[in-house]
Design a protein with these regions (language model features):
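Bacterial N-terminal signal peptides
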Residues: 1-9
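Long, amphipathic, charge-rich alpha-helical segments that form helical bundles/coiled-coils
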Residues: 69-80, 101-108, 112, 161, ...
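N-terminal Sec/ER secretory leader and immediately downstream segment
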Residues: 16-121
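A cross-kingdom marker for long, charged
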Residues: 206-256
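Short, charged, amphipathic alpha-helical segments
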Residues: 95-99, 119-120, 159-162, 184-189, ...
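Extended amphipathic alpha-helical interaction segments
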Residues: 124-206
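Secondary-structure edge/capping motif, primarily at the C-terminal ends of alpha-helices
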Residues: 82-89, 108, 112, 147-151, ...
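Boundary at the C-terminal end of the N-terminal hydrophobic targeting segment
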Residues: 12-14
Length: 256
């Protein structure tokens, strides 16, 4: 799930715009759930029009959290920020994010698995070797998931995935909102994935944190905006999803 949610290796610039975006062609299937691959989604956005990715780079320092579920959510958002910084070719931001990923991974007990990847990310960013940075970010996600599953922390692994999906959706809707198109909005048509996350959150009653409840409530708000059958997702719905995910993104990175 983690690799599927965060793999943001992007298509070449200047490719021909697609006649129509078919979300199923930009997806993989995880646990019988169609998971749109962000590398394909962001590549499709590039094809639909130029994107100023530097506007979406976020490198603010986060507060120190002690709750492992909170750290897992934050780790997901920071890994997603890493892919966005790569797309913007912002070497200082990528190097900073590499260090933050390592610190957060240590906070949930998987730092040893991430250390070599963090070093490789920083080295590749120094050389502006963006293909290698993407590859190491992808390996980071896989290592996080594998390490968590080995110690039966699957729920934390799911929160990492959720954090990344929320951040990716925040950026996706921000881009589409600025230059609305039906094809861009169609990239939000992910009702099965939303249901997947809702189901997983319902099974996390032991994580009794305000941010978890806020996300649960927010997903209820988002669902009718994107679960619309064969209809088109409207510009107003894109705006609302952006407002919701932006609010959650701010809540994830700040103290309660």
């Amino acid at each position: 799930m983690v690799a599927a949610v965060f793999g943001l290796a992007l298509c070449a610039h200047g490719a021909q715009a697609p006649q129509h975006v078919n979300i199923n062609q930009l997806s993989t299937t995880i646990e019988d759930v169609v998971v749109p691959l962000p590398n394909e989604l962001f590549g499709a956005l590039n094809k639909l029009g130029a994107v100023s990715w530097k506007e979406h780079v976020r490198s603010d320092e986060e507060p120190n959290f002690t709750e492992r579920p909170r750290i897992a959510l934050l780790l997901g958002t920071v890994i997603a920020d890493g892919f966005i910084a790569v797309q913007a070719e912002d070497a200082p931001a990528v190097k900073d994010i590499g260090q933050r990923v390592l610190a957060l991974a240590k906070g949930i007990g998987v730092g040893n698995s991430i250390t070599p990847h963090a070093k490789a990310i920083i080295d590749a960013a120094d050389k502006r070797n963006w293909a290698n940075v993407r590859q190491e970010l992808d390996r980071t996600q896989n290592s996080v998931q594998q390490a968590m599953n080995e110690v039966h922390d699957e729920k934390l692994s799911q929160l990492v995935s959720l954090g990344g999906w929320l951040r990716g959706t925040e950026v996706l809707t921000s881009v589409v909102k600025q230059h609305f198109s039906n094809d861009g909005a169609e990239l939000l048509h992910q009702p099965d994935l939303l249901t997947y996350f809702q189901t997983r959150l319902q099974a996390m009653s032991e994580f009794n944190l305000p941010i978890v409840h806020q996300i649960q409530d927010a997903l209820v708000e988002v669902k009718p905006l994107i679960n619309i059958g064969n209809a088109r997702i409207s510009a107003e719905s894109v705006k609302k999803v952006n407002e919701i995910t932006t609010r959650l993104g701010n809540d994830i990175v700040k103290k309660d």
